[in-house]
């Protein structure tokens, strides 16, 4: 954090390294600022993903009101940083990279762990879309198409809303409904 930045400067570290050290705890909550530097952004995402993967690998997962390691907040922070900075990155690749840094005996079933962590992020992206004012049906539609790239998922939601409010959408929906009904009868 802040003291780490001061120590890094005192030890002659590059200014970007020192700044990344101070930014790696950001965001601390939903309304907090995001890291300003690319280095701080990468370090913060990596640190939070490492914590989430490590906890899931150890069998420590949030349940109901229990989240002693603030994993939901850390996942929401990852989502906020990726979306807020418009980063085009694969969530699955970030998870896989974090898993690769753990010994096999800790990870166990790496594929199963990756799926569990990926599914954990689904509710975070749903919450973000809901907080941005998207309706339930729009959220369902865009999440059903996948959310591996969080920035694209939010852009997809905006595009669905834009298209949904046009006459063409109604015509396409009617045509699809007719074709779907005919296919059921065949």
Model-identified regions with their sequence ranges:
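Amphipathic alpha-helical "coupling" segments that flank catalytic cores
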Residues: 1-186
